[in-house]
Structure formats: structure tokens, C-alpha cells
């Protein structure tokens, strides 16, 4: 099923930058739609480190990833926006003075402005080379720390590099 939506701004990414874009656009009276591949608003702040303190937000000594996203959501409450989760933008093309963007769920957006706030992109864990690793998900294998209490006073093993 194809759905057509006209909006002032299409924002790709519903993390902190996408949410702040809603705020700035809202101050100008513009209507926004956000599209995100994740199943919830907040990007990496929610997906990877909801309980981890963040120290480099201007004017905020520290707050967790969840607190940061909650603050941004509170800030944009008065504004006109809609969120489309579990979708990605598969195609963008220019049509006259507008942009046409199509999502994986069959939504077609017509807009004058597209703001790409995709950050580091969609979080895709590198799964261990064992048979059916997802059957152990939450039972010994986790791809992100969503609650530090789950691991408190326990021995853990971390496999990986980079941000692991």
C-alpha cells in the first residue's frame, strides 16, 4: 500500500540531531516528518547507552542518553511532527522544486527540504560466529547495555573491538 505525504521537512534519523531539527523547524512554524530504521526514537543514545552519562552537551554538565532524549522530546512537544519508525528511506529524487523520498514501508514523501540526521547510521550488531546466536539473546548474549543493573556484580566477557 502506497501512502503519499506532503511535508515542509523530511528528517532522516530520529536521534538527537533529528529531534533538535524538529525544534528548530518548529520555531519557524514548519511541519516535519521523521523516518528512522530503529524501532524507537533516540538513535544511539537510546539503543546503545541509555544509562551512560554524557558529558559533552553544551550547557548540561551531564545526563544519561535516556535523559537527553527525554529532554529533547519534551522540548518538541508543542510542534507539528510525525514519526515513522522501523523504516528506511530507500530512494530520493528531485522533481521540479520538490524532493520525492520513498520508504521501505511504501510511504512517498513530497517535500521542499530533506535533512539527513542519520549520525553513524543504523546500529547493526556483528553477531558471533555460532549457530543461531539470537536464541541466546537476553540469555547470555547482548549487543548493547540497556540496563547496567543487569550486569552488576557479575562476571562478563566482552567480544569485539571499537566501542565494545
Q: PLM features: what roles do these ranges have?
A:
Residues 3-6, 10-39, 137-164:
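Rossmann-like dinucleotide/flavin-binding elements
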Residues 22-24, 46-47, 126-130:
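Short amphipathic alpha-helical segments
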Residues 27-29, 50-52, 131-134:
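Glycine-rich, phosphate-binding/catalytic loops in enzymes
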Residues 54-59, 125, 152-153:
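A short acidic, helix-capping loop that chelates divalent metal ions and anchors anionic groups
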Residues 105, 114, 118-144:
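Glycine-rich beta-alpha-beta "Rossmann" dinucleotide-binding loop(s) and their flanking helix/strand
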